[in-house]
Curated annotation (Swiss-Prot):
Protein name stated in the entry: Small ribosomal subunit protein uS2
Residues the record lists as N-acetylserine modifications: S2
Gene: RPS0
Biased composition annotated in UniProt, kind: Low complexity: 245-261
Record's compositionally biased regions (Acidic residues): 222-244
Job of this protein: Required for the assembly and/or stability of the 40S ribosomal subunit. Required for the processing of the 20S rRNA-precursor to mature 18S rRNA in a late step of the maturation of 40S ribosomal subunits.
Family: Belongs to the universal ribosomal protein uS2 family.
Record-linked PANTHER family: 40S RIBOSOMAL PROTEIN SA
One Pfam family matching this protein: Ribosomal_S2
Length: 261
C-alpha cells in the first residue's frame, strides 16, 4: 500500500517501534501473515516489517476517524497488558472500551444490560478476544486487530502486524493509532505538532508495584520529617520561668521560720 508523503514513517516513530520490540514476532507463522515477515532470525524469531506495520496503523486510524460518532467504535482487550491502553485510547478518542472479560452476548443478545451495537470493533489479540470477533461476524461488524505472526485471521478485516504479547509493544501501537486518529480529526493541528501525551501512559502497570512504590514513598517522607520535628522541639522550645524563691516556700517551712526558737 502506497501512502502520501505526509504519512511516511518518520525516524522518530521507527525508533519507538524498535525500542518497544514491536518488530519481534512469534516463531510460528500463520499463512496469511507471511507477507508481513521481514526475515527470520537464527533463533527462529520472525522479524516483522515495521514499514507495513505503520501502513496498517494509518489505515486503521483512517477507518476509525471515518465513523461520525466516536462512541460507535468498540475497543476490546481481554489480555491484561492491553486493558490500560484500551481505556486510555477510549478516553482520548471517545470510543467505547471493553476491558477485561468479554461478556458473551454483548453484540448479539439485546436482552443483556451490556448490549452494544458498534459500527467497528478493534481488538488487542484475535486469540484472546475470539468471542468479540465471533459475535462481530454474526452481526456484520468490521474488525481491526493487532495480530502477531501466529494469530488467526478469520473474520479480521484489517490486521496490524506487531508483537501483541509485550506490554510496551501493545501500549505503543494503541498510542500511535490514537495519535493518528486525533490528527485526522484535526484535534492535533498538523503532523509536525507533537502530541502532549507520552506513550508511557498507555503501558501496563502492575498494581502491586504501584502500591509498593507508594508505600516506600510514604516511609521515606516519614523518615525525613521525623528528625526535623525533633530538632525544632530541641532548639526552639521555650522553657518555663520558675520563681525559685516562691516555689521553695511551703506552709510548714513558713510556720517554722516564724516561731520563737
Amino acid at each position: 500500500m502506497s501512502l502520501p508523503g505526509s504519512f511516511d514513517l518518520t525516524p522518530e516513530d521507527a525508533k519507538l517501534l524498535l525500542a518497544a520490540n514491536v518488530h519481534l514476532g512469534s516463531k510460528n507463522v500463520q499463512v496469511h501473515n507471511k507477507p508481513y515477515v521481514y526475515k527470520t532470525r537464527p533463533d527462529g524469531v520472525n522479524v516483522i516489517n515495521v514499514g507495513k506495520t505503520w501502513e496498517k496503523i494509518v489505515l486503521a486510524a483512517r477507518i476509525i476517524a471515518a465513523i461520525p460518532n466516536a462512541a460507535d467504535v468498540a475497543v476490546c482487550s481481554t489480555r491484561t497488558f492491553g486493558q490500560r491502553a484500551v481505556l486510555k485510547f477510549a478516553a482520548h478518542t471517545g470510543a467505547t472500551p471493553i476491558a477485561g472479560r468479554f461478556t458473551p452476548g454483548n453484540f448479539t443478545n439485546y436482552i443483556t444490560r451490556s448490549f452494544k451495537e458498534p459500527r467497528l470493533v478493534v481488538v488487542t489479540d484475535p486469540r484472546t478476544d475470539f468471542q468479540a470477533i465471533k459475535e462481530s461476524s454474526y452481526v456484520n461488524i468490521p474488525v481491526i486487530a493487532l495480530t502477531d505472526m501466529d494469530s488467526p485471521s478469520e473474520y479480521v478485516d484489517v490486521a496490524i502486524p506487531c508483537n501483541n504479547k509485550g506490554k510496551h509493544s501493545i501500549g505503543l501501537i494503541w498510542w500511535l493509532v490514537a495519535r493518528e486518529v486525533l490528527r485526522l480529526r484535526g484535534i492535533i493541528p498538523d503532523r509536525t505538532t507533537e502530541w502532549s501525551v507520552m506513550p508511557d501512559l498507555y503501558f501496563y502497570r502492575d498494581p502491586e508495584e504501584i502500591e509498593q512504590n507508594a508505600t516506600e514513598d510514604i516511609k521515606t517522607d516519614d523518615v525525613e520529617e521525623a528528625p526535623a520535628a525533633d530538632a525544632e522541639t530541641e532548639w526552639t522550645g521555650e522553657t518555663e520561668e520558675v520563681d525559685w524563691a516562691e516555689s521553695g516556700a511551703t506552709p510548714a517551712a513558713e510556720e517554722a521560720a516564724a516561731s520563737n526558737w
